[in-house]
Amino acid sequence: MIDPDGYRPNVGIVLMRQDGQVFWARRVRRDGWQFPQGGMNTDETPVEAMYRELQEETGLLPEHVEVLGATPGWLRYKLPARAIRRNERQVCIGQKQVWFLLRLTGDESHVCLDHTDSPEFDHWRWVDFWYPVEHVVMFKRGVYARALRHLAPLAQGVAGQGVTAMPKSAAEAWMPGHTAGHDRPRKRPRSRGYWPKKAQGDVPPT
């Protein structure tokens, strides 16, 4: 499912402990680490896709987490040119995402990376809230910075001083000049709700 602009609808998941540390996982047979994420099916809402991806990639169920909030509207990133398959009938140039912040309420022993026949990850650990902005693959750093900026006030409401303001090193990690292939963040008002009260333009279905 690709939109007319070439973006595939997708959800991202920031899974957080009570102390503000977040779930960080290594992709199978690759050196790259990232948050759980995945594409939406045609008949799914973002919330439904989030719970499906959560179970597929981490083994966690809805009763193991609490949804603290989500980014309002879509956040986009572009794929690097080498990753775009130009010979496809529908060319995908990137992802448009809704990011969810979840608090782990169950025991972390419930995490199971080989829950499916084709696991996405082979290892995971807890890292500081802003760590992923500096360590995810370069073309995703912009969208990670935007997502975590939106979600930080919600995270601070749970973890308090466990989640600080974005450090300078993270703020600079995604800036133009480091790479091509990601969107430069636009200033958006912070929101504690799931979606804008009035849907304007291209916003996720509820």
Swiss-Prot record:
Location of motif Nudix box in this chain is: 38-59
> What are the disulphide bonds in this sequence?
none
Top-rank taxon: Bacteria
Any single GO molecular-function term of the entry would be:
pyrophosphatase activity
Q: Where is this region: Disordered?
A: 175-206
Q: Which UniProt keywords apply?
A: Hydrolase
Q: Which InterPro entries match?
A: NUDIX_hydrolase-like_dom_sf (IPR015797), NUDIX_hydrolase_CS (IPR020084), NUDIX_hydrolase_dom (IPR000086), RppH (IPR022927)
Domain Nudix hydrolase span(s) in chain numbering: 6-149
Task: Return any one Pfam family short name.
Answer: NUDIX
E.C. number: 3.6.1.-
Required co-factor(s) are:
a divalent metal cation
What enzyme class is recorded for this protein?
hydrolase
The record's function comment reads: Accelerates the degradation of transcripts by removing pyrophosphate from the 5'-end of triphosphorylated RNA, leading to a more labile monophosphorylated state that can stimulate subsequent ribonuclease cleavage.
Question: In which family does this protein belong, per the annotation?
Answer: Belongs to the Nudix hydrolase family. RppH subfamily.
NCBIfam families annotated for this entry? PRK00714.1-4, PRK00714.1-5
Q: What name goes with this protein?
A: RNA pyrophosphohydrolase
Q: What is the organism field in this record?
A: Stenotrophomonas maltophilia (strain R551-3)
What gene is this protein a product of?
rppH
